[in-house]
Amino acid sequence: MPDQNTPDMQLIAFKGLIEHILNHCRRVLQHINPIFQRAGVDYFTHFYLIINKLIVVEAMSKLEIRESPDAVTTYEMYRAIKEIKKLKKSIPKEHRQQLQMANFHKCFQRNVNQWIDLATERCRSRIKQAIELDTVVQVTEDVQFSSSAVDGTEFLLLLMKLSDELEWPAKAEAFTFKIFVVKSVCECALFYVSEVYNRLRPEDMFNQQGNFRATEKLSIVLNNMQHIKTVIMKHLMEHSLEQSGKKLTEEEQDIQTHSKEVMGTIIQSAGEDISTKLASIICQIILKISPDITALIEAIVERKTPTTSLEMSVIDPLMSYLASNLHTLGNHLLTPVFQLILTDMWCMSSDCLQRVLNSDAAKKSSDRSQYTIQRSNSSYRASESSSMLMVLGSTWRA
């Protein structure tokens, strides 16, 4: 049986006492004090002033004797005292100035980083478990991402709310804690992206011959990463730009401005890191299809300028290859991800065509092909979404 007199056990017992006092305060306000008030006695004020001194003095002593008190216990204690403090509005104003509880948060200042670390650790653990239990979630008739992206988003949003739940009275310190929370959310978002990225296997992107193939799992992984990036970055930016509800001193305003700049940098960096992971997968796709597209373009350019409908079919193998790969991706990917792939595929095809034009073998049809590039690039700049397929086909069939 554990020793009840250890500092740990005393802290846990005191936390339970505070929670009991909170419940009793609410019961006194609702049921007991009205009875006393009918007799002209303000029972709640007397009771509140007594527990005010007891809580602050005892809480400080219990926390000071521990070098590293349990984070869960201290956080639950802090929340309970915070709720008790809010009840001061139920006592006369002249008594509120006497409250030692007004600065109770100072007792817990050294514990805040522990709370953030614990919340971050729990968020990462929940994210990992969500990935282990992944199931497919239908977004539209074709587009999908997995349950871990939905659950992961919820876990990240819960972590993000920690700085608001603290309601830390000292604004300068509150801004610092908010930065720590934003940093933790970004780290957990990157943890999710890295976990789903590392679970992507070669067979999810390539067949046994090493050729690219668009699979459901590839689409889901890309959609998951994009979903986390879009939702979390949006909420984080809104969170970082929130204004303090209280009037700030000039010094606090300067700290708030600096804090927003720091948080903006952290969020932007996290977004770029997620984009880098996405780009890494897309790069693998483009590298795999590059040899096939190069061969198909070389076959087109080596032909003379088409003059009959039979010769015009020389473009069809390239059109068919691009369409077969883009069709599946276009149907199953979120639009921003598909746009990234389409853009890179177009740039790679355009670069390949330019290289072929510069070769000796392409001299016979260089004028016609140069016109193709110029017209294609012009059209692509006007509309990125699908011009690659349309322009190549229409140019050679003109």
Report each predicted region and the residues it spans.
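Extended alpha-helical scaffold/tether regions of large eukaryotic proteins
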Residues: 1-398
